[in-house]
Design a protein with these regions (language model features):
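The conserved acidic donor/metal-binding loop of glycosyltransferases
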Residues: 72-76
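Short aromatic/hydrophobic "clamp" motif used to bind/position activated sugar donors
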Residues: 68
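Active-site-adjacent helix/loop segment of glycosyltransferases
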Residues: 177-249
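Short, acidic, metal-binding catalytic loop of nucleotide-sugar glycosyltransferases
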Residues: 3-6, 24-37, 41
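Glycine-rich, basic loop-to-helix element that forms the pyrophosphate-binding segment
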Residues: 46-63
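Conserved donor NDP-sugar-binding/catalytic core segment of glycosyltransferases
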Residues: 80-113
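A recurrent flexible, glycine/aromatic-enriched loop bordering the glycosyltransferase active site
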Residues: 125-146
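Donor nucleotide-sugar recognition loop
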Residues: 152-173, 180-190, 196
Length: 249
């Protein structure tokens, strides 16, 4: 009988910035030890995708690894064994999707869980640190981990022309399948400041909520709590667009 090939991670990165890709992500990957991986680069300029979901699904379908790591080009692994440690969590825990930062509803309040750092000053990205994987409601998109056996049956939903909320979408899919949504302890560095909010986000949240309105009364994200009631949602998005236009937040 043919011996099974070694387990492997597939890293999928959608990038339009070769400098950041080479100096941040690839540079830190070159130092990783005790782990087998392939790196799949999807050039968003070359293919002209209209959404993150399309680009990530395109890359994910090329993956041969047991676990798919959808990763931003400005992620830097700070420890030489960090990728191997994340792989060990994948093997020890059963999950539908995992990340390194997430949001959870605790008694009506949004709490963020993560050990990662972000921004040039390397500030903590969340208000709660963890020492073991924790279950959350949704995850941040800087790193999304999906078992290949899950991705073969479930891809990112194309909710509209947007590069937002694909991690939230996948987490909501997994919860409907009763598959855990986890955050793994990791002290990696997301070199950008994580401030990806723009006006398109508020269109995307309306598309996303419309898709899941029969399943969830509210949806939790890093930028707020969003009601499934269409009137309340439109009012909130109008207010948030106005606030963003005036204050940038």
């Amino acid at each position: 009988m043919k011996e099974r090939e070694l387990e492997m991670i597939s890293l999928i990165c959608v990038s339009n910035d070769h400098d950041k890709l080479n100096t941040i992500l690839k540079a830190s990957l070159s130092r990783q030890k005790n782990v087998e991986y392939e790196l799949i680069i999807v050039d968003s300029n070359k293919y002209g995708f209209n959404s993150a979901a399309e680009a990530l699904n395109f890359g994910g379908k090329q993956a041969k690894g047991d676990y798919l790591f959808f990763i931003h080009h400005d992620i830097s692994f700070q420890d030489d064994f960090e990728l191997a440690e994340l792989e060990s969590y994948c093997k020890k825990f059963s999950f539908g999707v995992a990340g390194v930062a997430g949001v959870k509803n605790i008694e009506g309040k949004v709490a963020t869980f993560s050990n990662i750092f972000h921004g040039e000053q390397k500030t903590k990205a969340a208000n709660k640190s963890i020492s073991t994987p924790v279950e959350v409601d949704v995850i941040d998109e800087c790193l999304i981990i999906v078992p290949n056996k899950v991705f073969s049956k479930n891809q990112f939903s194309v909710i509209g022309p947007t590069w937002h909320l694909y991690g939230t979408d996948f987490a909501l899919q997994m919860k409907l399948l009763d598959l855990p949504v986890l955050v793994f302890p990791s002290e990696l560095w997301h070199v950008s400041d994580g401030k990806s909010l723009n006006l398109n986000y508020f269109d995307a949240i309306q598309w996303l909520v419309q898709r899941y309105s029969k399943n969830y009364s509210v949806i939790y994200t890093f930028f707020g709590v969003w009601p499934s009631n269409p009137i309340l949602l439109k009012m909130k998005c109008f207010y948030r667009k106005l606030r963003f236009y005036i204050k940038g937040v």
